[in-house]
From Swiss-Prot:
GO terms for molecular function: magnesium ion binding; phosphopyruvate hydratase activity. Keywords: Cytoplasm, Glycolysis, Lyase, Magnesium, Metal-binding, Secreted. Belongs to the enolase family. The lineage of its organism: Bacteria, Pseudomonadati, Pseudomonadota, Betaproteobacteria, Neisseriales. Binds a second Mg(2+) ion via substrate during catalysis. This is Enolase. Catalyzes the reversible conversion of 2-phosphoglycerate (2-PG) into phosphoenolpyruvate (PEP). It is essential for the degradation of carbohydrates via glycolysis. Pfam families: Enolase_C, Enolase_N. The gene is eno. Mg(2+) binds at D242, E285, D312.
């Protein structure tokens, strides 16, 4: 087996024009694996540390040259000569080299770029696509996409408090059909927004950001577009929300500024339950703040049997925090963001824990993305059956969808599309 002979990092730009880390891992066979890491806008407080330079003279302080230097020096020295197929040992070496709980010494952006690049190099070395290298042989599920078509909150400059309003094409028979369904609804929604005088500019994740009065109005707009595109809401297409509630949770209340409301945890639970009663909502992400575990318990007890409740900020893809959440009975699903935890091995460990505990997993992008399509392969490799990677515009989002099209084609009869079966944990 080949060994690692060089590790090279560089500073590149993400989809928001901010610096991020890209890494090349070279093997003595001449094979090279490359990975670039994403960056979030609304972030959980317990996420692994993304190392920035803080030099206001470069990129307004957001440069990542320190992280790049860590890769090119001490990380490179530590990995030369190692077997790239021993992912667990590679990642453990990186964690020990960093020596902190939050990867604050080397930077999670440095560690993750190397971790994923090693896996890509190893996959190339053994002649397998990444999803097969990590996921093994046999049948595989393509993920049902959560397509973010209307943006609010931290992702938009409008009055909507809920951050993401998404469509899930559960009635499709294949991923290819699901993507077509989403694209047709997206373009229909664009025309409806234009006809109503709303802006059709798109946000960080490719969705529209109309200046609507109430969160409910965004759902109504999506249902109108779904119907006009020729699909049946509640049958062909379901709605998913990302509340990003930590962003508007202050002093023990959920402040929906756009609707002039300040709600207790119980009141906000009832607010969300009413939306679910009135509309075909199948999934709610970050329905409560990461600091409000009691609120999460209320929400889970009320809706957990019939709605997927996804923990993002509250779990930050951290196996230890997820284990505590499972013990306390909060949420029933894990959002998986590889840069929240900062290594491939820890990401896979979190997904495995969720699966063994009866929780679903949703593979996810970040609002600041690159052309790297690793999460598409990870979604298939882990059979998590759901992916969240933006709207039907912006090439940084389409890179993931297009990779999934290729994977479905490569798998042929070994590929399945789960549709509603992705929510196997609901009654």
């Amino acid at each position: 087996m080949s060994s690692i002979v060089d590790v090279i990092a560089r500073e590149i730009l993400d989809s928001r024009g901010n610096p991020t880390v890209e890494c090349d891992v070279w093997l003595d066979s001449g094979v090279m694996g490359r990975a670039a890491v994403p960056s979030g806008a609304s972030t959980g407080e317990k996420e692994a540390l993304e190392l920035r330079d803080g030099d206001a003279r470069r990129y307004l302080g957001k440069g990542v040259l320190k992280a790049v230097e860590h890769v090119n020096n001490e990380i490179c020295e530590a990995l030369i000569g190692l077997d790239p197929t021993d992912q667990a040992y590679i990642d453990q070496t990186l964690l020990e080299l960093d020596g902190t709980d939050n990867k604050g010494s080397l930077g999670a952006n440095a560690i993750l770029a190397v971790s994923v690049a090693v896996a890509k190099a190893a996959a190339l070395e053994v002649g397998l696509p990444l999803y097969r290298y990590l996921g093994g042989s046999g049948p595989m599920s393509l993920p049902v996409p959560m397509m973010n078509v209307i943006n609010g909150g931290a992702h938009a400059n409008n009055t909507l408090d809920i951050q993401e309003f998404m469509i899930m094409p559960v009635g499709a028979r294949s991923f290819r059909e699901a993507l077509r369904c989403g694209a047709e609804i997206f373009h229909t929604l664009k025309k409806i927004c234009a006809d109503k005088g709303y802006s059709t500019a798109v946000g960080d994740e490719g969705g529209f950001a109309p200046n609507l009065a109430r969160n409910e109005d965004a759902i109504k707009l999506i249902l109108e577009a779904t119907d006009k595109a020729g699909y049946v809401p509640g049958e062909d297409v379901l709605i998913a929300l990302d509340c990003a509630s930590s962003e508007f949770y202050k002093d023990g209340k959920y402040h929906l500024a756009g609707e002039n409301l300040a709600l207790s945890s119980e009141e906000f639970t009832n607010y969300l339950a009413t939306l679910c009663d009135n509309y075909p909502i199948i999934s709610i992400e970050d329905g409560m703040s990461e600091h409000d575990w009691a609120g999460w318990k209320l929400l889970t007890d009320k809706l957990g049997d019939k709605v997927q409740l996804v923990g993002d900020d509250v779990f930050v893809t951290n196996p230890a925090i997820l284990a505590e959440g499972i013990k306390q009975g909060i949420c029933n699903s894990l959002l998986v963001k590889i840069n929240q935890i900062g290594s491939l091995s820890e990401t896979l460990k979190a997904v495995d824990l969720a699966k063994r505990s009866g929780y679903t997993s949703v593979m996810s992008h970040r609002s600041g993305e690159t052309e790297d399509s690793t999460i598409a392969d990870l979604a298939v490799a882990t059979n998590c059956m759901q992916i969240k990677t933006g709207s039907l515009s912006r090439s940084d989002r389409m890179a993931k969808y297009n990779q999934l099209l290729r994977i479905e084609e490569e798998l042929g009869s070994a590929a399945s599309y789960p549709g509603r079966a992705a929510f196997y944990h609901l009654k």
